[in-house]
From Swiss-Prot:
This is GMP synthase [glutamine-hydrolyzing] subunit A. It catalyses: XMP + L-glutamine + ATP + H2O = GMP + L-glutamate + AMP + diphosphate + 2 H(+). Heterodimer composed of a glutamine amidotransferase subunit (A) and a GMP-binding subunit (B). Residues 1-189 form the Glutamine amidotransferase type-1 domain. GO terms for molecular function: ATP binding; GMP synthase activity. Keywords: ATP-binding, Glutamine amidotransferase, GMP biosynthesis, Ligase, Nucleotide-binding, Purine biosynthesis. InterPro entries: Class_I_gatase-like, GATASE, GMP_synth_GATase, GMP_synthase_A. It comes from Methanococcus maripaludis (strain C6 / ATCC BAA-1332). The gene is guaAA. PROSITE patterns: GATASE_TYPE_1.
Length: 189
């Protein structure tokens, strides 16, 4: 099972639905849920930190990002929280918008396996990661944001600024499936 921490974003139920389409069980929990409560359930194989409107109301997510031994994926605000937890810098975007953008994948990696080096995604850019922590590598960027996706260099911790769970994002299902594979789920190819 994947647990989705609800940071108040409008797409949190869409994340759960996208996982259901992949036949991956998932449940939504409040962002006040602790890592200890999550790992007490032996069925949980991965954590998704959802998007949301307010980074100051989701600080429990930082502890999860720092201490989880199971894979973590941060989406939008979740991505920013992961970066902030490890010492990255998050601030207002230069180009504040909610729109379709082109994502450029730097090189094939485990999160973007089977995804072309250039694809269209739906993204929110009110705030964004400006400086990536040293223990992370940048996986993807766009014309308006230099840090569209990150991965911890040693742990299975990922972040994406864009929304893979919405239909406007090409290959979003592939990206979510790749994360689920890191969590130990298997799929027929």
């Amino acid at each position: 099972m994947i647990v989705i921490l609800n940071n108040g974003g409008q797409y949190v139920h869409r994340i759960q639905r996208s996982l259901k389409y992949l036949e991956v069980p998932a449940k939504i929990v409040p962002n006040s849920t602790t890592l200890e409560e999550i790992i007490a359930d032996s069925e949980i194989k991965g954590i998704i930190l959802s998007g949301g409107p307010d980074i100051t109301k989701a600080t429990n997510c930082e502890n999860i990002a720092l201490n989880s031994e199971i894979p973590v994926l941060g989406i939008c605000l979740g991505h920013q929280l992961i970066s902030k937890a490890y010492g990255g810098h998050v601030s207002r975007a230069d180009s504040e918008e909610y729109a379709s953008i082109t994502i450029y994948v730097k090189e094939e990696n485990d999160l973007f396996k089977g995804v072309p080096s250039k694809f269209t995604a739906w993204a929110s850019h009110m705030d964004e990661v400006k400086v990536t922590p040293g223990c992370f590598e940048i996986l993807a960027y766009s014309d308006i944001c230099g840090v569209e996706s990150i991965k911890h260099k040693e742990k299975s911790i990922y972040g994406v600024q864009f929304h893979p769970e919405v239909s406007h994002t090409e290959y979003g299902d592939v990206i979510l499936k790749n994360f689920c594979k890191k969590c130990g789920f298997e799929f027929e190819e």
